[in-house]
């Protein structure tokens, strides 16, 4: 019976046109869904503001906030540490003011709030400053938005956070530089991400031959198309998994028949036969 009552209330709200009545329902009704529906029906900015300021329920505040247009009020909410972080972040998303976002990015005490502000900034010089921030998550968000190749290379070399190095690599296009990262990175995932962006065959061969990481060798080999080189690996490499990778890219059917007959490892036989 109670569920029917709540369902009826929610249906009733859909027919209410009085903004004041919708406000009262939003603030005081017993059923949470009915309250949310009432907020969705409110169109007057003054009423939405009152609902936002007078409700203690975070979800209801967020629903009202989605419809609030006043930049002044949104900025006040974004700056107020007394509000939940998700409310402040929602306010930041609705603000259209680069200089205001910079203030938040520089001075706010909440890491997630700073990151949200940084994610909306387009000023490359400012983003470069934040890419040197003491807080890794702020650096991470900033580096994703930077296009300066030389700056990204420097961060890839100097930052000590693998996630940030990885993000820098994603926007670097210098193949020789990526090879150096692939061969010299201490973190295997970072080295792998560099290989993932390399297309030049001579660089992939060098990485395969010189990398200390198995996954990096595997990735490089999987991108090599030179048939003569692949045949050498298929015959001479001591690791059966790498021989399989090489064989899977070889097109010479007679060669594959020979490997199926002569290789001592069962998985290599199967790869040579079935690809």
Question: At which residue positions do the language-model features occur?
Answer:
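Alpha-helical scaffold segments
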Residues: 1-275
């Amino acid at each position: 019976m109670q569920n029917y009552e709540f369902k009826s209330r929610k249906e009733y709200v859909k027919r209410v046109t009085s903004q004041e009545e919708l406000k009262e329902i939003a603030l005081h009704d017993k059923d949470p869904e009915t309250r949310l529906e009432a907020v969705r029906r409110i169109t007057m900015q003054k009423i939405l503001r009152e609902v936002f300021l007078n409700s203690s329920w975070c979800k209801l505040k967020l629903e009202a906030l989605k419809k609030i247009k006043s930049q002044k009020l949104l900025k006040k909410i974004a700056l107020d540490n007394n509000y939940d972080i998700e409310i402040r972040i929602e306010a930041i998303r609705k603000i259209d003011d680069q200089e205001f976002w910079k203030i938040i990015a520089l001075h706010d005490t909440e890491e997630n709030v700073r990151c949200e502000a940084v994610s909306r900034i387009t000023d490359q010089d400012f983003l470069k400053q934040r890419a040197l921030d003491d807080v890794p998550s702020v650096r991470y968000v900033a580096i994703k938005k930077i296009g300066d190749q030389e700056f990204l290379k420097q961060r890839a070399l100097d930052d000590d956070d693998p996630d940030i190095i990885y993000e820098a690599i994603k926007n670097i296009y210098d193949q020789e530089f990526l090879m150096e990262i692939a061969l010299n990175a201490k973190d295997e995932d970072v080295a792998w991400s560099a290989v993932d962006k390399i297309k030049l065959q001579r660089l992939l061969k060098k990485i395969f031959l010189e990398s200390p990481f198995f996954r990096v060798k595997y990735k490089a080999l999987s991108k090599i198309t030179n048939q003569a080189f692949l045949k050498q690996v298929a015959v001479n490499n001591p690791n059966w998994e790498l021989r399989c990778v090489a064989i899977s890219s070889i097109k010479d059917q007679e060669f594959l028949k020979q490997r199926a007959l002569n290789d001592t490892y069962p998985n290599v036989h199967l790869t040579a036969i079935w690809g």
